[in-house]
């Protein structure tokens, strides 16, 4: 009997050990020396669901260009909590965590699996285990799946471990953390759809930073802090401070700003606070009136240290949302109503730091030396990581709008450009409608660029465009079938950023309307000479021309001189530089 009992207990121990091992990552099993391939994500996703069917759902939310499934784990305390419609109905807060948007920066994948396993096997802090009673966790281990499988030892030369890792960009060479607004990649289309489905209160994007060598192991950067509704900003700030305090208690050396020197390789130049444009994950969440958190573990820490830091950021966030998330979730719905009624309010589109306000901070760095370089022909910096130092450096804390506009009633898109605009609106889950009745001639605002400049080189598959100018009132014909996008909806801030032409992440800035800024008809020089001779008989034109000749750039350019007269001729294309979107300040019937 005793022998039989030993056999049973031994079998149970093997089952428990085997089960636990089956849920561990390659990173855990190799003591944080290696990270697994994507097949491990597939296996673990299904293994967690099999062992904890009431608590985990392994979902596929898209397919990559190379044909791989994009996986997410939904984790909650009950089967109902795994359903997005239930979470919305019960106002259950959702915490969204993604790893591997840059697949070489893969800490988030292993951190998330580690924390989920410990929670479900009751190895985590009891408060963290209980957090799932109040919160649904949606975890995407690897966003950039194809990039993850471009595995290699030399993909991250500025990073310590793991032994091999994935690549920064996708198989189509998109940097996904520049794609949130333009939604070019199949991966981003799938991700935005997932965000629309779950509507998380907060989303964490887990990265590894490059940059200088210093002692701090993790940074968190939040949005929105300097724009949007006051209550949402306060929510983001409170979460930030609570997470930082939690990390300090656990022995981490966290930062609440992005640790990039104002001048490259010059530690004494210090740091500043900033605002992430909505092309970035945290900025995108911010303009959706949600909280976005960028997590940057420090690349020069070993992999074990970095993964632990990422894990603890997620854990602290879960604890905070478990405590306050239900109240915040109810509040955010009320705030969405306020976002829908911001017509006429001024809002920043781009921001910069003022030099007026700064504070001296104690930054934990290392001794360094700057000297001339025979290689680059300039200076180089050398860090001595065995000689820790405390740097006294400035942190510039005042952030001010650089470009601002007032939120209008809405935007009208003529039929001719809807094939460009509609897919973007649908991707973001923005409401719009076709104008059915004959509106006829109506006074709207149009934007005709005073000047415009194309980017000198391609960026993320686009030739960017910068414009100057102002909206001006003009009467135009509004036709049935034209598109109306009202800002009286919860995604008003997102709409505002998409359509305001001077915004850094507007559809115009990304080059979607470049054809409207390309000259397609011309006047021969000899014809222009004849036209100019006649025009110069007009004293007013002659006076303006002679004034412009005092500008050396104009005086020395035959092209600019001839164009001056061509622009005054009736044959000049009046649609050149005309933004093909109208702005309205009154409700459309």
Regions found by a protein language model. Give the residues of each.
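Structured catalytic-domain cores with a bias toward divalent-metal coordination
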Residues: 4-6, 17-589
């Amino acid at each position: 009997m005793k022998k039989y009992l030993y056999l049973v207990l031994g079998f149970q121990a093997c089952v428990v050990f085997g089960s636990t091992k089956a849920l561990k990552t390659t990173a855990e099993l190799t003591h944080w020396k290696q990270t697994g391939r994507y097949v491990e994500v597939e296996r673990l996703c299904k293994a967690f669901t099999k062992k904890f069917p009431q608590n985990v759902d392994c979902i596929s939310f898209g397919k990559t260009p190379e044909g791989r499934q994009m996986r997410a784990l939904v984790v909650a305390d009950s089967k109902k909590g795994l359903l997005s419609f239930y979470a919305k109905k019960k106002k259950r807060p959702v915490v969204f965590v993604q790893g591997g948007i840059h697949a070489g920066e893969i800490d988030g994948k292993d951190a998330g699996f580690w924390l989920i396993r410990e929670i479900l096997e009751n190895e985590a802090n009891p408060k963290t285990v209980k957090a799932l009673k109040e919160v649904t966790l949606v975890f995407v281990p690897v966003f950039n799946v194809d990039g993850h499988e471009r595995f290699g030892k030399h993909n991250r030369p500025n990073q310590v471990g793991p032994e091999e890792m994935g690549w920064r960009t996708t198989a189509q060479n998109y940097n996904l953390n520049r794609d949130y607004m333009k939604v070019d990649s199949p991966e981003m289309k799938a991700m935005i759809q997932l965000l629309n489905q779950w509507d998380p209160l907060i989303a964490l994007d887990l990265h590894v930073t490059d940059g200088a060598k210093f002692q701090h192991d993790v940074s968190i950067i939040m949005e929105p802090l300097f724009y949007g509704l006051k209550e949402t900003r306060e929510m983001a700030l409170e979460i930030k401070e609570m997470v930082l305090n939690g990390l300090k208690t656990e022995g981490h050396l966290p930062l609440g700003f992005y640790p990039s020197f104002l001048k490259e390789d010059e530690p004494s130049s210090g740091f500043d606070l900033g605002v992430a444009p909505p092309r970035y994950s945290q900025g995108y969440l911010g303009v959706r009136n949600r909280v976005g958190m960028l997590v940057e573990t420090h690349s020069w820490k070993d992999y074990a240290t970095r993964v632990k830091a990422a894990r603890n950021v997620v854990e602290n966030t879960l604890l905070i949302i478990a405590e306050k998330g239900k109240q915040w979730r109810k509040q955010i719905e009320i705030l969405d109503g306020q976002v829908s009624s911001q017509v006429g309010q001024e809002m920043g589109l781009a921001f910069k730091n003022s030099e007026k306000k700064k504070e001296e901070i104690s930054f934990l760095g290392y001794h360094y030396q700057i000297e001339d370089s025979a290689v680059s022909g300039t200076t180089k910096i050398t860090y001595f990581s065995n000689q820790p130092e405390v740097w006294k450096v400035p942190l510039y804390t005042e952030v001010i709008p650089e470009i601002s506009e007032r939120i209008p009633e809405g935007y009208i898109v003529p039929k001719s450009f809807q094939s460009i605009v509609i897919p973007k609106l649908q991707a973001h889950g923005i409401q719009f409608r076709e104008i059915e009745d004959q509106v006829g001639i109506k006074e709207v605002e149009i934007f005709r660029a005073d000047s415009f400049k194309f980017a000198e080189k391609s960026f993320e598959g686009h030739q960017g465009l910068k414009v100057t100018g102002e909206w001006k009132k003009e009467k135009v014909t509004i036709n049935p079938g034209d598109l109306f996008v009202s800002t009286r909806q919860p995604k008003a801030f997102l709409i505002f950023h998409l359509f305001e032409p001077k915004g850094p992440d507007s559809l115009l800035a990304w080059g979607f309307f470049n054809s409207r800024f390309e000259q397609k008809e011309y006047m021969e020089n000899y014809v222009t000479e004849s036209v100019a001779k006649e025009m110069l008989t007009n004293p007013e034109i002659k006076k303006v021309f002679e004034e412009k000749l005092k500008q050396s750039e104009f005086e020395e350019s035959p092209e600019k001189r001839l164009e001056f007269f061509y622009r005054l001729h009736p044959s000049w294309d009046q649609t050149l530089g005309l933004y093909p979107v109208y702005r309205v300040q009154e409700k459309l019937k």
